[in-house]
């Protein structure tokens, strides 16, 4: 008796230990613990053989990883939260009902739309490597697209369903997957059941064109943002480089500062001919007398002016006007008549009271302002501007022609 009691007690302890240390079955809606890096991404054959067929035969599944949901009672965007596992695609066991009691067409209507089949059914064949081996047909795969609204004017969406169902050798639904016969008041409901279980994979297709446009827009926005961010640094670097190395390229802020001192720099150049006050005017007059050319004077570059408007190469102050019969080269500027540099020198000798006004007034009224300003400043013209101004001629007044008959 003692030995039997001890053996029965040890058996009870072993049973209790087994139940205590046995892992609990996974609950519905809870994701199973998969090792890092593992994903549930079976092939079509694996889905049919190891999951759908065993589900139809009521055999134990390898893992409780596919939820049982009637897909046609929900919209596709509501299904991901009902899945057991999945990130970009979700798997479900779902029943199928008939659309009509005496027909074989399935009911594809959902809550706010319907599923529409696309393409033809794809047979799922057993894998085999033997030469001339006839591969067994295991099931059928059908692709469907979800449309919002009512047929036939539904709005197509990007939600896709792959539906897997079993077939026998003749291509019809297997007997194990057919609903059992029922009696009583539930006969009408049972007559609409087409399949007990089908296996469905749901995912949302990504529009590659829209994704590409979005990526390009993002890159464009990033480029603009980078350019705006880098602009202050470029402006600061340009100002520093221009001051340290005498570069011809300056930042916009520096150009603004130089433009504000343009007239000051125009009349305050030293050494070469334009110093402040009466000294600069005297130098200009002396240079005018010494030059044999009537209207061309060349100024050397000056580095002490706030605006370096003289190029290293000699530049003419004013362009030479062409002579035509009856054309008077004299121009009245203010109270002075300037036809040559001698007139300018005389104005300077008289005290220079009107010389500055004459020079200031002469610039804006001179024809070809754009060309002459670049000549005075010593800035090289771009090819397009040079070509446009190369054929410029001064206005010609021909005597004896009545322009207003």
Curated annotation (Swiss-Prot):
State whether keyword Lipid biosynthesis applies: no
Major localization class: nucleus
Per the record, the GO terms for biological process are: regulation of DNA-templated transcription; system development
As annotated, the DNA-binding region falls at 138-211
Annotated compartments: Nucleus
**Segments of skewed composition (Low complexity):** 1-10
User: Per the record, GO CC terms?
Assistant: nucleus
- The reply to whether Transcription figures as a keyword in the UniProt entry is yes
User: What further note is attached to this protein's record?
Assistant: High grain protein content (GPC) is a desirable trait in breadmaking and pasta wheat varieties because of its positive effects on quality and nutritional value while Low GPC is a desirable trait for barley malt and beer production.
List the PANTHER family hit by this protein, alphabetically: NAC TRANSCRIPTION FACTOR 56, NAC TRANSCRIPTION FACTOR NAM-2
Q: Provide the domain comment.
A: The NAC domain includes a DNA-binding domain and a dimerization domain.
Designated name of the protein: NAC transcription factor NAM-B1
List the gene name: NAM-B1
């Amino acid at each position: 008796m003692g030995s039997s009691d001890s053996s029965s007690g040890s058996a009870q302890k072993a049973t209790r230990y087994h139940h205590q240390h046995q892992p609990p079955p996974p609950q519905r809606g809870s994701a199973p613990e998969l090792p890092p890096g593992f994903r549930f991404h079976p092939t079509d054959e694996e889905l049919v053989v190891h999951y759908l067929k065993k589900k139809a035969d009521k055999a134990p599944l390898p893992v409780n990883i596919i939820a049982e949901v009637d897909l046609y009672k929900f919209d596709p965007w509501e299904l991901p939260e009902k899945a057991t596992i999945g990130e970009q695609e979700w798997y479900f066991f779902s029943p199928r009902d008939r659309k009509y009691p005496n027909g074989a067409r399935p009911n594809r209507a959902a809550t706010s739309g319907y599923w529409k089949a696309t393409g033809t059914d794809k047979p799922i064949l057993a894998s085999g490597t033997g030469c001339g081996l006839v591969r067994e047909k295991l099931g059928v795969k059908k692709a469907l697209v979800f449309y919002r609204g009512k047929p036939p004017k539904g709005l197509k969406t990007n939600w896709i369903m792959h539906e897997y169902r079993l077939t026998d050798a003749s291509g019809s639904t297997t007997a194990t997957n057919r609903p059992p016969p029922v009696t009583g008041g539930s006969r009408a409901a049972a007559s609409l059941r087409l399949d007990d279980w089908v296996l469905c994979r749901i995912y949302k297709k990504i529009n590659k064109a829209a994704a590409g446009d979005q990526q390009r827009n993002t890159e464009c926005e990033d480029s603009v943002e980078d350019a705006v961010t880098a602009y202050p640094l470029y402006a600061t670097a340009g100002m520093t480089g221009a001051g340290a190395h005498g570069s011809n390229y300056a930042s916009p802020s520096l150009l603004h500062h130089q433009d504000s001192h343009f007239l000051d720099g125009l009349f305050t150049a030293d050494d070469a001919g334009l110093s402040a006050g009466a000294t600069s005017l005297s130098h200009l007059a002396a240079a005018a007398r010494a030059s044999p050319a009537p209207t061309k004077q060349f100024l050397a570059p000056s580095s002490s002016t706030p605006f370096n408007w003289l190029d290293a190469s000699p530049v003419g102050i004013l362009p030479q006007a062409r002579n035509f019969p009856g054309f008077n080269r004299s121009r009245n500027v203010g109270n002075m008549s300037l036809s040559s540099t001698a007139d300018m020198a005389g104005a300077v000798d008289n005290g220079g009271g009107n010389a500055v006004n004459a020079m200031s007034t002469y610039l804006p009224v001179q024809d070809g302002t754009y060309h002459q300003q670049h000549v005075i400043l010593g800035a090289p013209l771009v090819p397009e501007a040079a070509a446009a101004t190369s054929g410029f001629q001064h206005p010609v007044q021909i005597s004896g022609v009545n322009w207003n008959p």
